[in-house]
Amino acid sequence: LREAGIQAPILILGCTPSFYGKELMQYNITQACYDLSYAKALSAEAQSAGGTITVHIQCDTGMTRLGFLCDEAHMTQSAQEITEAVRLPGLHAEGIFTHFSDSDGSEEYTMMQFNRFLDIIQKVKELGYEFAIRHCANSAATLLYPATYLDMVRPGIVLYGHFPDRTMDPGL
């Protein structure tokens, strides 16, 4: 995309091996950072290249894939680890995000995830770090839950004219 002249911000939500740190810096691509060991690996790559990698901290509030765990049992530890990660040399922690696992289905579960996300943001803030960008709204949440917009939304499939769930009423 960069070689084609695209200058808009690019955020990789998946995992990029840390040895591609130079490319992340060269092309000014923001990388999701899902745990402290990955943050340390990205930091080492950035330092060895003499640059800075921009990251968004990924929080697992209930999707159970990648991210700092944000359930009640792990909230305090994750807040401490996130705070350590954002202070590593060579990293610029611009944002923090989570992903809703069922925002086109369960309002109760989506709101539980949203509240966990707000809790981790607050705990990290209490430890002295505030993120410029907070985001969690995927396609379904963009359509159904305006309260979850925060600083940015991530519509995906709706950009192609499809609804996240075939049973959703488009309301048109």
List the predicted regions and their residue ranges.
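Active-site loop ensemble at the mouth of alpha/beta enzyme cores that anchors a bound cofactor
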Residues: 143-172
